[in-house]
């Protein structure tokens, strides 16, 4: 998997666009889509490691911290720039921490939690001794679906990545306690950095929505 550098980038609404030919734009969109899917896959890998009963508690917390680094604001309040008509920064605009929608078969209506809280709940769940195993299995990155890549500013893009997530928990006698399958949509922000060594993608995840939850059969 290609290593992706993580940075927090702000001012997503900068003005100015550079025209691209259709072929160049299509090629760039494919690269962005693949990079976005791989970023989401890194997040889902962290989820599976967090709930793995074979992991030490301190390792679960490390995976939680790694997962938070994939998001805008790293799970905390983040800011973007407010510009005047000349493009000068005149203020900072705060945004609430990114959220994850959670659902269940009993409560299918999505409920929002901060990503930081969601991940902490997974750590606590995996640390409970009442479960023999807890697992989260997600779509492989190459099978994830991506919406149309949209340009929002110069060298800045956004898209939505769709994946399925299967949750399963088993009791001490290995009896299945609960399982479901949820389709999720995550907003992904991409910025292109032009460096002396070539172009780099800076990728950060935004809010995650649960679009459908059903029985895992």
Segments from the language model and where they lie:
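Short, low-complexity N-terminal intrinsically disordered segments enriched in polar/charged residues
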Residues: 22-65
């Amino acid at each position: 998997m290609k290593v992706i550098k993580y940075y927090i980038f702000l001012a997503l609404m900068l003005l100015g666009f550079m025209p691209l030919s259709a072929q160049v734009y299509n090629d760039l969109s494919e690269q962005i889509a693949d990079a976005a899917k791989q970023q989401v896959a890194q997040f889902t890998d962290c989820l599976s490691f967090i709930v793995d009963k074979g992991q030490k508690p301190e390792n679960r917390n490390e995976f939680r911290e790694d997962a938070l680094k994939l998001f805008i604001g790293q799970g905390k309040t983040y800011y973007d720039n407010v510009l005047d008509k000349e493009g000068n920064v005149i203020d900072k605009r705060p945004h609430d921490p990114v959220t994850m929608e959670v659902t269940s078969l009993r409560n299918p209506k999505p409920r929002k939690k901060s990503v930081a809280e969601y991940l902490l709940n997974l750590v606590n769940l995996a640390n409970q001794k009442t479960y023999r195993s807890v697992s989260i299995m997600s779509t492989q990155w190459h099978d994830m679906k991506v919406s149309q890549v949209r340009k929002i500013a110069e060298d800045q893009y956004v898209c939505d990545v769709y994946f399925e997530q299967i949750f399963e928990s088993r009791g001490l006698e290995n009896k299945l306690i609960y399982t479901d399958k949820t389709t999720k949509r995550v907003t992904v922000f991409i910025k292109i950095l032009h460096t002396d060594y070539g172009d780099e993608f800076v990728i950060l995840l935004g809010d995650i929505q649960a679009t459908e939850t059903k029985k895992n059969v």
